[in-house]
Amino acid sequence: MESDCQFLVAPPQPHMYYDTAAAAVDEAQFLRQMVAAADHHAAAAGRGGGDGDGGGGGGGGGGERKRRFTEEQVRSLETTFHARRAKLEPREKAELARELGLQPRQVAIWFQNKRARWRSKQIEHDYAALRAQYDALHARVESLRQEKLALAAQVDELRGKLNERQDQSGSCDGGGAEGDDDDKRNSVMNASSSGLVEEDYVSCLAVPVVDVSEDGSAACGGSSYEYDHHLDYLGGGQLPDPFCGMPDLWETWPMVEWNAVA
């Protein structure tokens, strides 16, 4: 049973992210080798076609079979490739070709094509893994950004409440201080008023003592007045206290007038 693997396989298309200087150099070298192999194969096919024309049509069929690998050959090449990822030495290629009944150049070209396809698939796999990690990190960053905005909003709200509470506390303290000042001021005014009233009351009650001597003269408030017996009706010969406390009345109403009336 023949395999679909061709002897000459076209190089894989470069991936959109597999665009490096090393890859470009490998691809150019690969193309040069493929062109040389195609020229060599065309020359061999021309020689085989001439032989077929002279000896029959079997030569063309033999050339077509040379361009394909059998399933057993492909399986052996795949096993060797997965076991030996590194490039094979020329001696190893010759031994493998002799075991599989192939030419060393056929084995070298197959390994070269297989390695290019494997690199492309590996790069795609790595890119997919990195892309998944990037998407996860991007989602995490967005989540952290939203969380940061939410925390900033909470901080602003708490700061506003704290400032409002401090303002209210300051206004209450100011009002209390003003109230204390008013209370102190009222206390001082009340004390002053009480002092004035008590002073007036004490001055009114501070009545000088009237002494009546044997000669009939009376001393009241530090002044001497002649005692008149006609004043007995006022209270046993003693003047009321208010009159003693107000000497102006005595100046306005002298004792002479009282005697004249009597």
Swiss-Prot record:
One of its GO terms (cellular component) is nucleus. One of its GO terms (molecular function) is DNA-binding transcription factor activity, RNA polymerase II-specific. Gene3D superfamilies: Homeodomain-like. Residues 44-68, 162-189 are annotated as: Disordered. Keywords: DNA-binding, Homeobox, Nucleus, Transcription, Transcription regulation. Induction: In leaves by drought stress. Expressed in roots and panicles. It is found in: Nucleus. Belongs to the HD-ZIP homeobox family. Class I subfamily. This is Homeobox-leucine zipper protein HOX24. The gene is HOX24.
